[in-house]
């Protein structure tokens, strides 16, 4: 029997990815079915459903699921889930699809069939529905009223833009996943299925694992957070987003090299595991933090490191709103229905010259002038402009990799700073 935290949902790992003869037969069948082109976001969602990362989901959400998740963080069956996982279709495409149809979900970028789907429901998403979803999922302490939110959200919030630009209908139903796309080949050993990360943790004898979410290269604060986690847990799972990012973000392969260099040179051997997952960012701030904890539970992690401005977007969210939201979510009764992965809440961290080391607001009594505030956004901005980094911002091995990347770019990358990145 496993010592690890059970997957979310009480059904074990729900994996929709076909293999062997069944996979080959379904691929042939997909070529004969009506084809629906899907977005990069839907592709990532399908892969996560395929490998069990989104357990207990086995398909795209019904309207009851969508509404329950938006309003109450609950699927229709009462299981906790923080963010809608839906498949949109244009009015023209939806008109050709009826409830009961089987369709093939096609990735136009790779020209590959990603899944087949049995359509169990087709529901309209009016502009009012999209506004409802945006206000429920994306509003935060930085814009506490709808009026304040919509003043800037349509232009400045990528998650809102994504939802408002979706098709006029959503399609729901179970899926059979046919591919993991480019991830196994491009990121061997980094891209992992939940069953694989669980096997690694079991082999090491770990029970309590903290997950570290990354979409920026690791700087000293990231390193410090991971080492705090290692002090109180058996190990740390450094888990990077390797799906689509915002323009100006550093590519996954460069970030992987940075993590490798840092772990090799500054971590005790066998206390950290690096992994990657195939989702796109949803830019949902605190709710995205909950999603990170939910699927990390499926990967075998019992704790989720939540620091300052986790999954933040500009100034839409409070600095620690992604921590406090864990205290407000429902805890439904029934096996597997509640979220079991708990937050490891850590205050704002920085390098302090007077402390002569890394510290946090909880441990350092010194003035702002004595501190080097660290953020991934600021790191990218300084390097993209060819500037010198302050001492103690990043490890030399990591900075060398990043400088080489930026020096090789043919076009300058503009990086904008917001309050979270500047310390304001």
From Swiss-Prot:
Transmembrane segments: none
One Pfam entry name: PUA_2
EC numbers: 2.7.7.4
HAMAP family assigned to the protein according to its UniProt record, in alphabetical order: Sulf_adenylyltr (MF_00066)
Species per Swiss-Prot/TrEMBL record: Desulfatibacillum aliphaticivorans
Family: Belongs to the sulfate adenylyltransferase family.
Protein name, per record: Sulfate adenylyltransferase
SUPFAM superfamilies recorded: Nucleotidylyl transferase (SSF52374), PUA domain-like (SSF88697)
Pathway(s) served: Sulfur metabolism; hydrogen sulfide biosynthesis; sulfite from sulfate: step 1/3
Domain of life: Bacteria
Keywords assigned by UniProt, alphabetized: ATP-binding, Nucleotide-binding, Nucleotidyltransferase, Transferase
Keyword match Nucleotidyltransferase: yes
Keyword match Ubl conjugation: no
Catalytic activity of the protein: sulfate + ATP + H(+) = adenosine 5'-phosphosulfate + diphosphate
A molecular-function term among this protein's GO annotations: sulfate adenylyltransferase (ATP) activity
GO biological process, one term: hydrogen sulfide biosynthetic process
């Amino acid at each position: 029997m496993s010592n690890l935290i059970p997957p979310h949902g009480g059904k074990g790992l729900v994996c929709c990815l076909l293999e062997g003869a069944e996979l080959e037969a379904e691929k042939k069948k997909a070529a004969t079915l009506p084809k629906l082109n899907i977005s990069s976001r839907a592709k990532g969602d399908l892969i996560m459903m395929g490998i069990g990362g989104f357990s207990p989901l086995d398909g795209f959400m019904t309207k009851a699921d969508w509404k329950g998740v938006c309003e109450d963080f609950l699927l229709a069956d009462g299981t906790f889930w923080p963010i809608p996982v839906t498949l949109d279709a244009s009015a023209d495409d939806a008109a050709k699809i009826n409830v009961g149809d089987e369709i093939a979900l096609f990735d136009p970028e790779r020209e590959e069939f990603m899944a087949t789907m049995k359509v169990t429901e087709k529901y309209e998403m009016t502009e009012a529905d999209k506004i409802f979803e945006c206000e429920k999922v994306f509003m935060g302490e930085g814009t506490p009223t709808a009026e304040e939110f919509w003043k800037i959200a349509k232009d400045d919030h990528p998650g809102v833009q994504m939802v408002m630009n979706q098709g006029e209908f959503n399609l729901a139903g179970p899926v059979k996943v046919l591919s993991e796309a480019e991830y196994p080949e491009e990121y061997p050993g980094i891209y992992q299925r939940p069953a694989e990360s669980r096997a690694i943790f079991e082999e090491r004898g770990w029970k309590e694992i903290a997950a570290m979410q990354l979409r920026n290269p690791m700087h000293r604060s990231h390193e410090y957070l991971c080492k705090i986690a290692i002090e109180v847990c058996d190990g740390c799972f450094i888990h990077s987003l390797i799906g689509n990012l915002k323009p100006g973000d550093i590519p996954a392969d460069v970030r992987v090299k940075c993590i490798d260099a840092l772990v090799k040179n500054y971590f005790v051997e066998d206390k950290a595991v690096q992994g990657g997952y195939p989702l796109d960012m949803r830019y949902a701030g605190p709710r995205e933090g909950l999603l990170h904890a939910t699927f990390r539970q499926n990967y075998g992690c019992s704790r989720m490191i939540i620091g300052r401005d986790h999954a933040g977007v500009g100034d839409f969210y409070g600095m620690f709103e992604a921590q406090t939201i864990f205290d407000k979510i429902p805890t439904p009764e029934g096996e597997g229905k509640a979220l079991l992965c708990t937050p490891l809440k850590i205050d704002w961290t920085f390098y302090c010259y007077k402390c002569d080391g890394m510290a946090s607001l909880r441990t350092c009594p010194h003035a702002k002038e004595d501190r080097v505030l660290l953020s991934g956004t600021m790191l990218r901005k300084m390097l993209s402009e060819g500037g010198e980094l302050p001492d103690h911002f990043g490890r030399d091995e990591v900075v060398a990799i990043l400088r080489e990347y930026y020096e090789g770019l043919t076009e300058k990358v503009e990086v904008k700073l917001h309050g979270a990145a500047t310390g304001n």
